[in-house]
Each structure stands twice: as structure tokens, then as C-alpha cells.
Curated annotation (Swiss-Prot):
One of its GO terms (biological process) is 3,4-dihydroxybenzoate biosynthetic process. Keywords: Amino-acid biosynthesis, Aromatic amino acid biosynthesis, Lyase, Schiff base. InterPro entries: Aldolase_TIM, DHquinase_I, Type-I_3-dehydroquinase. The gene is aroD. This is 3-dehydroquinate dehydratase.
Length: 241
């Protein structure tokens, strides 16, 4: 069983409000990672992003900051796709003030992804290589092979998030996650979304995953629950090991 970090997903439209700061401070004991979603923003000026990152750092919370630009192709609000997405990531990697960066998997662009991963790691960032499917869950062998292929690019963490349409989909995701945790170098994350897949969030560590994503208020993905509740449920497995 692996140790699971709780990531809280926040998505401020512009600046981080005083209320959001208070919420983060109040729940800090339940949070290991702040996933800062920036795909919903209107401004992507370097100075604006630097100020945003500094605001989080100034809270002096004992957390890592993961910056995510989720494209519309993978279920986000970001309109940057293809080369414009990769060029944006190159600029993002040059900015200081955060700890981890999410890079979306695309099998047709492995050379570009490899370059971005190397650049990010050279800049001192951990890389989460992620793949999302908000419609379905691929079959078990496809899930296992996805982890294998993503691992070959050298990211620190590989993440699959898929939508279950039946109970077997959840079981397949968890089996693929467990297999990956014992067979690849990268640390795996596996999420079965929606209420049906909730067990994948609460029992993430049992199957070898290392991050479970929660929220403070409005869920940023189907099936997310409040970080305080998520931390309590994860601790049940720690207590009863």
C-alpha cells in the first residue's frame, strides 16, 4: 500500500480571493498538494501567472503546487491545443514559484512531450503526465498498455482518469493501477470518475496510487469530494493496515 497525497483542485478565474485563502488555510492539514488549474483564466501573461504563484507561496502552507492547464480535448476549458499548447507549456516551465506541472499525454506527439518533460525536470519541476477520458473506460489491456507507454517518457508521475459506465470499468481501472504500481518506474495515479468510481479516490493507496484529488467547494471533476472528507477516508486505510 502506498502513501497517498491529497491534492485540492482550485480554479480561480483571475486572482486568488481572500475567501479562497481562508479556505486553504483552514483545510491545510488535509492538503498535501494544491492543483492550480489555470485553463479557465483570461490572462496568461507571464507577470500575471508569476503573481498568482507568489500569492500561493505567500500563504506559507506546507504543500506542493501543481500547475495544470487542461485543454478542451481532455475535458478542460483551455482553448490552446496542438502547437499553441506546447509553446505555452514551454513558457510556463520557465516561470518559477511552483513545484509540479501537468503535461497531457498524446501518443502522436511523444517527441515533443519528451522534450517538455526533460525541460521541466531540468528546471526542478516534477512532471505529471496525464490522460483523461470523460466518456468511457478503455478495456483492461488498453489501460495497462497506456501506463506502460506513458512511463517510457520518463515523467515522475503518470495519471489516468477515465469515466466508468459500469462496475467492471472501475475494477479494470483499479487492476491496471495495481499492475502499474508494481511494474513501471513512474509513480502511478488512477482515477475512475463519477460517484460510481469513488472507491478509486478513497482506496487509491491500496492499489498503489499516490495522489487523490479533492475539492474545497465545487468539484472540478466528476466524483471529487471535499478534501477534509477525503483525508479522513484515506486515513481509514492507514489506521487499519
Amino acid at each position: 500500500m502506498s502513501k497517498v497525497d491529497v491534492a485540492v483542485t482550485i480554479a480561480p478565474k483571475e486572482e486568488i480571493t481572500d475567501q479562497l485563502k481562508k479556505d486553504l488555510i483552514r483545510e491545510q492539514k488535509s492538503i498535501d498538494i494544491i492543483e492550480l488549474r489555470i485553463d479557465q483564466r483570461e490572462s496568461f501573461e507571464i507577470a500575471d501567472l508569476e503573481r498568482l504563484f507568489k500569492t500561493l507561496k505567500d500563504l506559507q502552507l506546507d504543500v506542493q503546487v501543481l500547475v495544470t492547464y487542461r485543454t478542451s480535448v481532455q475535458g478542460g476549458k483551455g482553448q490552446k491545443n496542438g502547437n499553441t499548447y506546447y509553446e505555452f507549456l514551454q513558457d510556463l516551465i520557465q516561470i518559477q514559484g511552483y513545484d509540479m506541472v501537468d503535461i497531457e499525454w498524446d501518443e502522436a506527439q511523444t517527441e515533443i512531450l519528451l522534450q517538455l518533460i526533460v525541460q521541466a525536470q531540468s528546471a526542478g519541476l516534477k512532471v505529471v503526465l496525464s490522460q483523461h477520458d470523460f466518456d468511457k473506460t478503455p478495456n483492461l489491456e488498453v489501460l495497462k498498455f497506456l501506463y506502460f507507454k506513458m512511463n517510457k517518457l520518463g515523467a515522475d508521475i503518470v495519471k489516468l482518469a477515465v469515466m466508468p459506465n459500469e462496475k467492471q470499468d472501475v475494477l479494470n481501472l483499479l487492476e491496471a493501477l495495481a499492475t502499474a504500481s508494481e511494474s513501471i518506474e513512474a509513480k502511478p495515479v488512477g482515477i475512475s470518475m463519477s460517484h460510481l468510481g469513488l472507491i478509486s479516490r478513497t482506496a487509491q493507496g491500496v492499489f498503489g496510487g499516490i495522489i487523490s484529488y479533492g475539492c474545497l467547494g465545487t468539484p472540478q471533476a466528476p466524483g471529487q469530494i471535499h478534501v477534509g472528507q477525503l483525508k479522513e477516508l484515506l486515513n481509514i486505510y492507514e489506521i487499519n493496515k
